[in-house]
Amino acid sequence: MQDSSLNNYANHKNFILMLIILFLMEFARGMYILSYINFLPTVTSIAVAITSLAFSIHFIADASTNFVIGFLLKKFNTKIVLTTGFILAFTSLFLVIWFPASPFIIIFSAMMLGIAVSPIWVIMLSSVEEDKRGKQMGYVYFSWLLGLLVGMVFMNLLIKVHPTRFAFMMSLVVLIAWILYYFVDVKLTNYNTRPVKAQLRQIVDVTKRHLLLFPGILLQGAAIAALVPILPTYATKVINVSTIEYTVAIIIGGIGCAVSMLFLSKLIDNRSRNFMYGVILSGFILYMILIFTLSMIVNIHIVWIIALAIGLMYGILLPAWNTFMARFIKSDEQEETWGVFNSIQGFGSMIGPLFGGLITQFTNNLNNTFYFSALIFLVLAVFYGSYFIANREKAK
């Protein structure tokens, strides 16, 4: 009994520390990717094309690394992989201090940061306890979202004081996360290493066994990300509001998401499979309706209400969807499988803005992008709704 209590305490301590590390790394990512490089064209000689390329390369590096990181963690062990990641992140962001307007350094740092964050995510997802998955995944996604947003806002404020003087803060945050890592005991599901050919075959096998999940993993991210390029224009040109009122809508959505992740996500635990199915299906349908409704709304107060509803639903849909995916994963392949899943999700988030921007540009109508996003959620609702209905008798 005492050993069990000690193990539970150790697991809880490790989980909390990993949450803090995830928060700090996402904080650094938010500072650099969402704030710093976006402001560079306005305060230095860096061209917008360079910062856009850096932004894209960051997420390409993130998604590509996720695809193989689970295998690398088991082949070289967590200490080597994570330490390498921290070195890459710290060194690349440290170089920004000395070369704040170097196109090569800006792109290189974005790529290295994308690689560095990947193993932390995979370890977090594979270390979640099954009987507390909904609750703990709520905490994981909350740490991710809070880190990104607070990092972005914090860097925005520092840039207003001076555009480049506080660049050292980004590498400092990574250094703190790096130090905290040495107080964590990370354990993988198994440590059996395989030859490269066997690992490639395993990637193919993992992919084939989870084809049912790929539409949801890929298209959810694509549908949401498709709206990113048009939302500022929608706010200022269609609803005719200031950037401050638009920011308030984003904040309201973020608050709704945070509340849901912290308090509603635990509803997923110890509930029937049908309840989980209902949350996922309701989420897809509600998203379809709300996104379609945005195309007809010109009142900012109604937009704020819709933003709150989207945030609340997102905060419980993510843990529910995560729990649904977890049921398909073999217990000894968690790192590899979560890595592949994260990679597919990353590619969805990359192609979404591309489609969203192209649809608006070639049709010259913002509403068509809303219709496109809503249609994706309709397709997901029909596809997975059919699966849930077919498997409802098996659900317990």
Swiss-Prot record:
Pfam entry (one): MFS_1
Membrane spanning residue stretches: 15-34, 46-73, 80-99, 105-126, 138-159, 165-184, 211-231, 243-264, 276-298, 304-326, 338-358, 370-390
Gene3D superfamilies to which the protein is assigned, alphabetical: MFS general substrate transporter like domains
GO cellular component, one term: plasma membrane
GO molecular function, one term: antiporter activity
Localization (cell): Cell membrane
Alphabetically ordered keywords of this record: Antiport, Cell membrane, Lipid transport, Membrane, Transmembrane, Transmembrane helix, Transport, Virulence
Family: Belongs to the major facilitator superfamily. LtaA family.
Free-text function comment from the UniProt entry: Proton-coupled antiporter flippase that catalyzes the translocation, from the inner to the outer leaflet of the cell membrane, of the lipid-linked disaccharide (anchor-LLD) that anchors lipoteichoic acids (LTA) to the cell membrane.
The name this protein goes by in its record: Proton-coupled antiporter flippase LtaA
